[in-house]
C-alpha cells in the first residue's frame, strides 16, 4: 500500500504544501510574501494574515499537482516549531483539522530537523544521492547556525551552535546597514561575485568547541563602515562589491573552520549543508574546495530546498510515519526549540 504524506510549512513568511509518495516528491508549492520587503524584515502580524489567506489554495494546488485526492493521504505532517508563533498556529491548526476530518494520523515536525532531512527528498525513484549515516550537517539560516551530527533520520545531536546572532541574521543586518535592502542574503551573494574577498578585513571570534558567534563580526563591520564613511560619504557605493565579498568570505571562513575541525575530530567525511544560507555561492564553493582538499563526500541541496518549503516537512513526516511516530491533537506549536 502506498504511503502518501501531505506536508505543511508555515513557520515564518512562506506558506508551503507538498506531497510525497513512498519517499518520492510529487509536488511542492510555495507562496512567498513580498509585503515584508518594505519593512526591512518579517512583520509577524502581516505574516499570520497572509498564511490564513494562502494556506487553503496552496494545499489545494499541492494535491492537484500531485494528482492525489485528500482521501488517498496516509497522514498530514506539519511544522510545529520553531518559528513565529502566529505563523505556526495557522499551519498547525489547519493541519490538525484537516487530518482529523480525514481520520488519518497527524505528524509534528521539527523545522530544523526537516532542513537536515531535505537531503533525502527524492524527485524520482532513481534519485539516490543521499548522505550516508553518520554524517555532519552545517545548518545555516537567518535564525540558526549549527553543526549537527546526524546518526539516523530521527537521531541528531547538536555539536555546536551560535551563542548570539546566526550567520544569516548577520548578513541581513550588514546588508541593511549598507542600505541594500531585505532580505540581504541574495543581495550580498550577487554583489560578492563581482568583488575582492580580500579587500577588507573584519574581526573573527575565538569561541571554544564547535560554537559560533557573529555579533562581533557585525559590530566590526558597522564600526569600520562608520569610519570609512567619515572619510568618503560615497564609500559604500564605491566599494559595495568588495564589502560584500569580504563580508561573505569572513562568514564562510568562520563557518568552515569549525566544521572542518568537527569532521577531523570525529573522522567523518560525509558532510552536508542545509538552510537558507546554503544557497550562498561562496559557501557552496568552499564546500567543493573542501571536498577536493580533504576527501569529503559533500551534499549541497537544490536551491528550491534551501529556503523554507513543505517538501522537507513531508519527507521528515514520511520517515516518522514509517516509525509510527505520530502526535496527538493536543500538542501545541512552539516558537523556540532546538533539535
From Swiss-Prot:
Record Pfam families: TsaD
Details of cofactor binding: Binds 1 Fe(2+) ion per subunit.
Cellular component GO terms held in the UniProt record: cytoplasm
Obligatory cofactor(s): Fe(2+)
Entry binding sites for Fe cation: 111, 115, 308
Reaction catalysis annotation: L-threonylcarbamoyladenylate + adenosine(37) in tRNA = N(6)-L-threonylcarbamoyladenosine(37) in tRNA + AMP + H(+)
Binding site for substrate: 139-143, 172, 185, 189, 280
Cellular localisation: Cytoplasm
Single GO term (MF): iron ion binding
UniProt cross-references to InterPro entries, sorted A to Z: ATPase_NBD (IPR043129), Gcp-like_dom (IPR000905), KAE1/TsaD (IPR017861), Peptidase_M22_CS (IPR017860), TsaD (IPR022450)
GO BP, sorted A to Z: tRNA threonylcarbamoyladenosine modification
UniProt keywords, alphabetically: Acyltransferase, Cytoplasm, Iron, Metal-binding, Transferase, tRNA processing
Top-level taxonomic group: Bacteria
Family: Belongs to the KAE1 / TsaD family.
Protein purpose: Required for the formation of a threonylcarbamoyl group on adenosine at position 37 (t(6)A37) in tRNAs that read codons beginning with adenine. Is involved in the transfer of the threonylcarbamoyl moiety of threonylcarbamoyl-AMP (TC-AMP) to the N6 group of A37, together with TsaE and TsaB. TsaD likely plays a direct catalytic role in this reaction.
Protein's name in the database: tRNA N6-adenosine threonylcarbamoyltransferase
